[in-house]
Amino acid sequence: MAKTRGVLLPCWKRVIPLLAAMVLTGPACTQNPPSAAAPPPAPAPSESLATSVPLPTSPTGTATPTSGTPAAATPASDPAAVLTGIPGMDFSALSPAARRELATVMSDEFCYCGCPHTLGACLKGHTNCKHAKRMARLAARMVADGGPATEVIVTLSKYYASFREPRAQLKVDPRMCQGDPKAPVTVAEFSDFECPFCGKARPILEGFAKKNAGQVRFCYLPFPLSMHANAIPAGQAALWARDQGKFWEMHDALFEHQENLKPESLPALAKSLGLDGAKLAAVLKTDQYKQELEGFRAQGRSAAITGTPSVFFNGRFYDLGYEAEMLAHSLEDELEWRTNNNAWSAD
């Protein structure tokens, strides 16, 4: 069973504990389990993040080594043989159980660099392949958190395939973005102010964006869920404050008072920010901003999201979990992919 240390899980996974224990990562608050719809090569950040390219054959997952290629890594029944003798890599700190799972991953999964070799064979046969080392470190993090090999392999295959899939078309509001508008990577988050998982992800995502301010522009897209009674009025308050020039101040206040977002409590929040609480109270009695909120939700549905938080790197769905190390890893991958015109650099 996979542990979930440091990873935020969806509301439906909380409702179904067995599934929760078997899932490594995912969005958080959602009404229904995710469907099989695929998430939407890297566009330049702009108010419209859209692109579409042909989907080449992926070297990962079900690829089969061609004749004459090196044999796959030693069977995972002998973890010591699989994991030792890899230049520059030491997995001795992993538990015996984690080493067994990692050995299976290295024996069964193929390196994403494009070669026809398993990860283990690539690490030992192509010592200059930086991609194999990055993939191995990512897999090691996952098994260290308790991820079984079968789930790690699926997660890795989906993650690397996502770079070659068409990107989601996301329109962001610059007033609801932080960071350099010209940053090479726009990280867009669909979020619900009443979602507890969004509240937990918030400091991680914002800290990541601030740490990488020169490379990341962080944008917020409201995605109020019907399961949260106060999500719509909270969204109205945020958009109203945006029009007063204080979106992020209201954004922070809403999350800091997440346990009490009833409409009658929101005018006091506005007043604490130096805004006119009476005007907000009047807005909340109308349908003002509801159509705009529905527009954001339509964007999310078009991007095949099923819950919050849901994050995209330049329109590429991110599903490695809300940990600083995982976010940094995906940022490095996105920068390489973008720099090399939607391809991995040659080893």
Question: Where are each of the predicted segments found?
Answer:
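Bacterial signal peptide processing site
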Residues: 28-32
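A short beta-strand-turn-helix
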Residues: 170-185, 210
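Bacterial N-terminal signal peptides that target proteins for export
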Residues: 3-16
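Immediate flanking context of iron-sulfur cluster ligation sites
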Residues: 96-112
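Local cysteine-cluster metal-coordination motifs and their immediate loop/turn environment
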Residues: 108-124, 193-197
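C-terminal cap of thioredoxin/glutaredoxin-like
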Residues: 33, 131, 186-191, 197-210, ...
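Thiol-based oxidoreductase modules, predominantly thioredoxin-like and allied folds used
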Residues: 214-232, 257, 287-290
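Bacterial N-terminal signal peptides
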Residues: 16-26
